[in-house]
Amino acid sequence: MRGVETRIQEIRHKIFTEVARMAYHSEWPVKERMEELPYKIIPGETGNFRNDVFLERAIVGERLRLAMGLPNRSAAEHAPVSDGIEAADQAETYYTPPLINVIKFACNACPTKRVHVTDGCQGCLAHPCMEVCPKGAVSLDRTTGRSIIDQEKCIKCGRCASVCSYNAIIIQERPCAKACGMDAITSDENGKANIDYDKCVSCGQCLVNCPFGAIADKSQIFQTIRAIQSGEKVYAAVAPAFVGQFGPKVTPGKLRAAMKELGFADVFEVAIGADLCAKQEAEDFLKEVPDELPFMATSCCPAWSVMAKKLFPDHANCISMALTPMTLTARLIKKHNPNAKVVFIGPCAAKKLEAMRRSVRSEVDFVLTFEEMAGIFDAKHVDLENMEEDPDGVSDASTDGRNFAVAGGVAQAVVDVIKRDHPEQEIKVANAEGLKECRQLLKLATLGKYPGYLLEGMACPGGCVAGAGTMQAIKKSQTAVGLYAKKANHQFSSETEYIKELDKLVD
């Protein structure tokens, strides 16, 4: 539903804005403010969305807690919204799992997969739906002449739907479960969505596909702002998928100026880290494939790499050991600014958990999504479109580095680095987008179907531009990133000035 301003986006934006406003007003008592906010966000005597103002406020209360980084609670727990706020009311608070949470009393308990005959059935003579059903679940209603499906016999294969000339048979699925490429969403005893965290990789696709807004993730909006207010030098590392996320007229120069107005010491483009990552992965590929490894998979998408390690542990060593663009950019910033704090601002929910890894925690202090950043801008009434342009724009990354944001871009950047130094080298590439496709790709690779290949996996269909923290329509973002990438001063990752820093950053 990215690119469509729904009621869910409206509520999420209000919550992010109010949390940011609360952080900026340090004179406000946080505990009391947390209790007041559900009434400010959902005013009046009647509900706007669910026809129950008390339920709406309760849901908003849990969303506020998650936006503060606090744990989600059940309806059975009797405690104020601000319960435990002391843990969040400080400048340095890391995310604690689980990151993605189902607010149970907001869940509609949608039915699981079901094949259904609609009123569009014409009761035709052919009835191909009956003929193709392998279980004899489709029969004819002698009164109406229409097809009916015995749900006890139906195995949800969808063959009947595929042969209906009138498209009168539909397959209904729980949206969150359908979006989950890890099959991590099931139903609890009340029919509510339940996340199996042993399977979940925190990609956030369930979050953006739930039509009831019952799934939410935790945030560090409050803590980031408090860190800036404390006087610490806080640097923004902005992922290349930012193009167009804050409006079609918001240029990189305007974004940089706006970030500085918020108090950030400076702004770096994570595409410079992507260039470094491409170079490191190219070197590792040439060194290890096929002599030491049967294939190599890219490492920049955390949901993809975590999925690979969970489902294919025997081939975990085939996931590139190269540092991700986020980590490399943060290291670069801290190398030149030793006492700095770094905020990664991007499209990805899974980056929040990547930042919790022991190997990354000292590099990346906070992670925010573009959607959360939009709330911060609104809290300070920053008019990005009319902001005076910062002539320096953002960092000088390459075309290939900026294209990391789009599916296929990572592998292309690595191949281009190899081809520059070894033009005779043949590089075989396979890529997948969406966790279902990614799982299939890795399954085939482990069976020996991709010997010597470079494999690229993107958990979100379309790449980073389709991440859970984006706001713009995916195709629009892909086009915008492509145009922005072409404006880079360098085509290839190995041509940028930052490449010389790589050896110092990965020692």
Label the predicted regions.
Residues 122-124, 248:
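Short, surface-exposed ligand-recognition loops at beta-strand->loop->(often short) alpha-helix junctions
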Residues 108-116, 139-148, 187, 205, ...:
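Gly-rich Lys/Arg/Thr-decorated short loops/hinges at beta-loop-alpha junctions or inter-strand turns
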Residues 105-111, 117-120, 163-169, 185-189, ...:
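Short, intrinsically disordered, charge-biased short linear motifs at domain edges
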Residues 1-77, 84-87, 217-507:
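Iron-sulfur-associated redox domains of electron-transfer enzymes in respiratory
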Residues 111-114, 127, 158, 204, ...:
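Short flexible coil/turn linkers enriched for glycine and charged/polar residues
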Residues 87, 95, 155, 175:
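Short sequence/structural segments immediately N-terminal
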